[in-house]
Amino acid sequence: IQDRLRTTSFNDTVQMHREQLRSLRRIEFEFAVPEDALPLRRPVARFPYVPDNPEKRDEHCREAYQIQVQGLMKRLTFTKTERVVIGVSGGLDSAHALIAATHAMDRLNLPRANILAYTLPGFATSDTTKNNAHRLMAALGVTSQEIDIRPSCLQMLKDIEHPFTGGKPQYDIAFENVQAGERTSHLFRLANLHHALVLGTGDLSELALGWCTYGVGDHMS
């Protein structure tokens, strides 16, 4: 929206399009509307960007994946950066981002050890999720480390006098965003320390669902 407000060339395009429409030749004719139902000449796919044909669907997925890899390669090359920092939760989004990062490093002839992957367990992190994160990082051969964010989260919750610190089981949005914010803060400070870029793990599905909390994990990634 801000880009549209700053850029004023869109009005020029509208005017040009209007003039082009005026120059089109118009041919009038009469057409009798049939009373019977008209069958469609071709089936219209319910999900046009996700083909029913498995081979075509795989082709589309590979293309989208290569766009991600190429975009990361371009950013690393442009900024002359050889390391990335990424938070790995054990879920699907961060797993996909981590795999894309490994392929970008391979194509740039950089060691996968330059991917600094961190799992940052919080109050609700399960052993299964944490183990999945460790197994994935080990399988991909990246530099991995675990940082428990609970102490720093607890300090912030105490600072803001959140009822959780008094023993009340209040798991509200403040409780959740303290953890998201701590994770993001850790990752950016680690990137500063190691002269790296933070690789976001958010995706368009999160954006479509409204998961873009300002200032913390979703918005920053």
Predicted regions: what is each one?
Residues 105, 140, 163-221:
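Active-site adenylate/phosphate-handling loop in enzymes that bind or generate adenylated species
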Residues 79, 86-89, 95, 118-121, ...:
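Generic beta-strand/beta-sheet core signal
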Residues 89-101, 128-131, 160-162, 213-216:
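Short glycine/threonine-rich loop-to-helix capping motif typified by GTGT followed
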Residues 1-87, 102-113:
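RNA-binding accessory domains that recognize and position tRNA/RNA substrates
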Residues 100-108, 136, 219:
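A glycine- and small-aliphatic-rich helix-loop capping segment at beta-alpha/alpha-beta transitions
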Residues 1-6, 138-143, 218-221:
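C-terminal, active-site-flanking charged/polar segments
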Residues 21, 28-45, 110, 114-174, ...:
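A conserved beta-strand->alpha-helix junction
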